[in-house]
Amino acid sequence: MPSYVITGASRGLGFEFVRQLSSDPNNTVIGLVRDKVTTEQAVAQELAGRSNIHILQADITDYEAVKDAVTATAQITGGVLDYLVANAAYISEFDAYDSIGVLGNSPKELEEDLFKSFKVNVIANVHLFNLYMPLILAGNIKKVIALSTGMADLDSTNKFELQVAPGYAISKAAMNTAIGKFHAQYKKDGVLFMSISPGVVDTGHYKNATPEQMAKVGGMFQNFVTYNPDFKGPASPEASVKDVISVWENASIEAGSGGSFVSHHGNKKWL
């Protein structure tokens, strides 16, 4: 009976991971969220009757709260964990539509945003992995997955001229390196660490954007089409999560997947 911990499970891709993984009653699915009450209400309304879902409250930047969540997880699973999925992330609105040079005109805000991006997307995940390692090591499957972004790929950044969201991209690139470091340490113990980009997904991130901001997003999408004529726009969370699960299910240390950073296709094709 595989066990999963999903961070950022209250909405978007995180909630979709909970939905898809809990569809198999043999799976134990644990979601870490900042608002337990609201998330449990959503589960009751949309995933009624699934007794294999457990929601724990923990802001991933709160070390003690995550530590308590590990204790609660162990009580649910009997002290083991098969999959740890680091989905929670800080996606800044400050840097979402501008280049790093433009953001440099607001140096204080830029610095604060970079610090927050690094704290949530890198430091919090490093603590998350360290705290859950005893349970992962005791598990059977031993897979740790971090949700990343194609924007963290240097070749992709240059090819698609990806100027926007620099803080998000920089922090995710740092997280990818952390994944490599963890895998280098725990490969000998049979633990697979890897980063997977979910692709371009419609999670409502741009729903409050101004026409000027959407014009910048449209320009980025046009670059995608130029380099990949098959690009039809953002995928649904359902399709993206299905692809990501397929990638980690097919990944193995023996196949060289450990410490890697791949797309939802399992390769370097980001769209």
Curated annotation (Swiss-Prot):
Pfam families from the UniProt entry = adh_short
E.C. no: 1.-.-.-
Task: Quote the record's binding site residues for NADP(+).
Answer: 13, 59, 87, 168, 172, 201, 203
Q: What class of enzyme is it?
A: oxidoreductase
Record's keyword terms, sorted = NADP, Oxidoreductase
Active-site residue numbers: 168, 172
Q: In which pathway does it act?
A: Secondary metabolite biosynthesis
GO MF terms listed in the record are: oxidoreductase activity, acting on the CH-OH group of donors, NAD or NADP as acceptor
Functional description taken from the UniProt entry = Short chain dehydrogenase; part of the gene cluster that mediates the biosynthesis of virensols and trichoxide, fungal natural products that contain or are derived from a salicylaldehyde core. The pathway begins with the synthesis of the reduced chain in virensol C by the highly reducing polyketide synthase virA via condensation of one acetate and 8 malonate units. VirA has interesting programming rules since the first 2 ketides are fully reduced, the 3 following ketides undergo beta-dehydration, and the last 3 ketides are only reduced to beta-hydroxys to yield the trihydroxy portion.
Family recorded in the similarity comment: Belongs to the short-chain dehydrogenases/reductases (SDR) family.
Q: What is this protein called?
A: Short chain dehydrogenase virK
Source organism (scientific name): Hypocrea virens (strain Gv29-8 / FGSC 10586)
Per the record, the gene is virK
